[in-house]
Amino acid sequence: MYKNWRELIKPKRLQVDADSLSDTYGKFMAEPFERGFGTTLGNSLRRVLLSSLQGAAITSVRIKGVLHEFSNIPGVTEDVTDIILNLKGVLLKLHGSDSRNIRIVKKGAGVITAADIITDSHVDVLNPDHHILTCGKDADIELDMVVAMGKGYVPAERNRDDKAPVGTIPIDSLFSPVKKVNFTVTNARVGQITDYDKLILEVLTDGSVRPDDGVAYAAKILKEQLQIFINFDEETETVVEEESEESRKINENLYRSVEELELSVRSANCLKNANIHLIGDLVQRSEAEMLKTQNFGRKSLNEIKDILAEMGLSLGMMLENFPDPEYLKMIQEGKEDL
C-alpha cells in the first residue's frame, strides 16, 4: 500500500504571475504532476471555484408604492423588471456572515447608479458606476434591499421570506465571486523526463475575493471533502535514499539566514518585518504573499527571485518537515565547534 501514493511525484512549487496579479485576476502555475493529474486537479479546482465559494448578493428589494415586479414607477424610465435586472448586476462585498439592509433614496431628476446605494461599514460596493435606474423630475424613489451571503445560484423563490414586509420582491441571486476560470495543461520536465504535467490556472473574480485567496479556499474545500475517503492509517516504512550532492547543497541553503542573500536594504527590511529569517521560510512564501508584505514591491520581488534562482530555489516551494529540529541542532553544533 505504501507505494500506491508515496512514489507518485508531487508538485514542488506554485508560481504566481506577479506582473498580472490584481484584485480580480490571477494566473497560477504548478508543477510537476504525474501524467493526467493536471487535468484531474485543474477541472476539480475549476468546478469548486465556480460553484462553491461564498459571496454577497442582493436577495430582495422593496420599492415604495410598488406591490409586485410587473409595476411601473411614476417618473422612472425603467419598469420594475428592468430595475431588478440591474440590481442583480450590483457587485457587493459583505464583511461578516449576517445579512444587511441597504437603501437608495432619490427625489427629482437624475441617473441612479450603485454609488447612490446607502450602506453601512459592513457592505462595500465594488462597481459604483453600475446603472440602476433613471429618474424624471417628478420621481420620488425609495428602494430597501437585503444583502446576504451565499454560494452558487439561488432562484428568487428560495429567497422569499414570509416574514418580510408587504411589497418585498425576492430576487434571483448569483453569489459566486468567481466569474471565470480557465486551465491548461502542458508538459513539465523532471531531470531528463518530460512526461509530466504542468497546470496553468487563470482565475477572474468580481473583486470581493482575491484570485489567490479563491484558489486557496477551493483547494481547502477539496481537501476536506476528500478526507472522509482516507479510512486507513499510513504504514510506517523507513526508506533510506542516498542524498545527491545537489540536494545536499539546496538543503543547506534552506537553513541559511536571509541576511546571507545580500539583498538591498529595502528588501532586507521587508523580510525582517515579515519575520522571515531563514531562506527556507522565504521560499515557502508565494509571490502573491510576498507582494502583500508592507513596502514590498515588484522590484524587491524580482531581486529575490533572481537570487533564489541562482541557488536552484524559487518562491512557492512546498517543504516537508521544515525546519527540521535535528538539522538545526546539527548546524548549531557545527557553529559552536568553529
Curated annotation (Swiss-Prot):
Transmembrane segments: none annotated. It holds the Pfam family RNA_pol_L. InterPro entries: DNA-dir_RNA_pol_insert, DNA-dir_RNA_pol_RpoA/D/Rpb3, DNA-dir_RpoA, RBP11-like, RNAP_asu_C, RNApol_insert_sf. Its EC number is 2.7.7.6. Residues 1-233 are annotated as: Alpha N-terminal domain (alpha-NTD). GO terms for biological process: DNA-templated transcription. One of its GO terms (cellular component) is cytoplasm. The keyword Transferase applies. Residues 250-338 are annotated as: Alpha C-terminal domain (alpha-CTD). The keyword Zinc does not apply. GO terms for molecular function: DNA binding; DNA-directed RNA polymerase activity; protein dimerization activity. CDD domains: RNAP_alpha_NTD (cd06928). It catalyses: RNA(n) + a ribonucleoside 5'-triphosphate = RNA(n+1) + diphosphate. Keywords: DNA-directed RNA polymerase, Nucleotidyltransferase, Transcription, Transferase. NCBIfam families: PRK05182.1-2, PRK05182.2-5, rpoA. DNA-dependent RNA polymerase catalyzes the transcription of DNA into RNA using the four ribonucleoside triphosphates as substrates. Belongs to the RNA polymerase alpha chain family. Homodimer. The RNAP catalytic core consists of 2 alpha, 1 beta, 1 beta' and 1 omega subunit. When a sigma factor is associated with the core the holoenzyme is formed, which can initiate transcription. HAMAP family: RNApol_bact_RpoA (MF_00059). This is DNA-directed RNA polymerase subunit alpha. It comes from Syntrophotalea carbinolica (strain DSM 2380 / NBRC 103641 / GraBd1).
